[in-house]
Amino acid sequence: MHILDKVDAAQLRDDIPEFRAGDTVDVHLKVIEGSKSRVQVFRGVVIKRQGSGIRETFTVRKVSFGIGVERTIPVHSPNIDKLEVLSRGKVRRAKLYYLRDRHGKAAKIKEKR
């Protein structure tokens, strides 16, 4: 297993800021369409973070035109151009699945002071 750990450690990113469930983030993702490449921003609330090492992922949720959109992204993905933490959320849970059933003001997360 030591060889696999070394391979994983070589691919880990160190430019990812510290964030957790409840935080509002901007994820700048590289999108390749044909031969062109561009950066697409996905802004939303982190509803879960799971795994460890190279397999670690997080899920970001936003409401776009009245429809909830969730995207699961590997933390150490080379497709992440930049990850910005916009605000820290005040939550008591590690997994915020209950936000899926809430709409409007009920889905709002209080900001840490």
Curated annotation (Swiss-Prot):
Q: What are the annotated GO cellular component locations?
A: cytosolic large ribosomal subunit
Q: Which GO terms describe its biological process?
A: translation
Q: Which PROSITE patterns match?
A: RIBOSOMAL_L19
Checking PANTHER family in the record gives: LARGE RIBOSOMAL SUBUNIT PROTEIN BL19M, RIBOSOMAL PROTEIN L19
Keyword Translocase part of the UniProt annotation: no
Task: Identify this protein by name.
Answer: Large ribosomal subunit protein bL19
Q: What does this protein do?
A: This protein is located at the 30S-50S ribosomal subunit interface and may play a role in the structure and function of the aminoacyl-tRNA binding site.
Q: Which UniProt keywords apply?
A: Ribonucleoprotein, Ribosomal protein
Q: What is the lineage of its organism?
A: Bacteria, Bacillati, Actinomycetota, Actinomycetes, Mycobacteriales
Q: Which family does it belong to?
A: Belongs to the bacterial ribosomal protein bL19 family.
Listed GO MF terms: structural constituent of ribosome
Q: Which residues form a coiled coil?
A: none
